[in-house]
Amino acid sequence: DIDVIGDGELDIMNDAEIPAIIYDVFSAMGLKRFQIRINNRRVLNGFYSMLGLTEQSGEIMRTVDKIEKIGPDMVRAILVDDVKLTDEQADEILKFIAITGTNEEVLAALKGYCGRDELFDRGYEELSTVIKYLGGFGVAQENFKVDLTIARGLDYYTGTVYETALLDYPQIGSVCSGGRYDNLAEYYTDRKLPGVGISIGVTRLFYVLGEQGLLNDALNTAPADVLLLPMTEDLSFAVSLATRLRERGLRAQLY
């Protein structure tokens, strides 16, 4: 897991740095055909508000989040039969999340909805800023995409959301997902601690690395050059020795 937690506030720049780190990590491992798909839940909630569906927004997002697994027809059926939307509302939602094109084209289409809902406008500004910063972090254009189908089914996400796909392995689903959570810490403390983070599905990732022959010596490096096995309860000598080894550039670990 990778998380950044703010004290009181957390700049939107961090929402871009998280996927930039994933880009650097995946690239360093030799992966090339991957895509970080990005959306913003404020955009989705704001759009549902325009349709008069604020109270149903959670159910709608959890349903839309399944679209890659069950397809748009089944999503529409659930929205109408279970969530109790009208045919017109369901069609409007499917039309909205089907907006596609280059990042610039999708953002231009979203801009046409601005001015009708404050939450949507805020989400649009956040999403636009994240996309701009990703370019500044050096993330290649082909490796990130605005994707309005990305919702993340967990309700604690409040803004930016991500899923990462390995394009040659669509059957394994997302290998890296996460997003912005402004209010999650309120269950544990009175302090406002907004955060943004992402988790890597290690099992899925290592399967692909193995398939592509990328589990080389560089990725199998031992965690230490020297493993110290103290034979007494007094660790003073072992700690001192480990310190001297580290001062000489060796990675020493106490067992």
Describe the role of every protein-language-model region.
Residues I36, N40-F47, G52:
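Glycine-rich, mobile lid/loop segments that gate access to catalytic sites or pores
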Residues I36-N39, I67-D73, R122:
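Short acidic alpha-helix initiation/capping motifs at coil-to-helix transition points
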Residues G52-V80, L166-D168:
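Acidic, His- and aromatic-enriched active-site or binding-groove loops in soluble protein domains
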Residues D1-K32, R42, R76-Y255:
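Positively charged, Gly/Ser-enriched RNA/tRNA-binding surfaces
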Residues R37, I60-R62, A252-Y255:
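A generic structural motif
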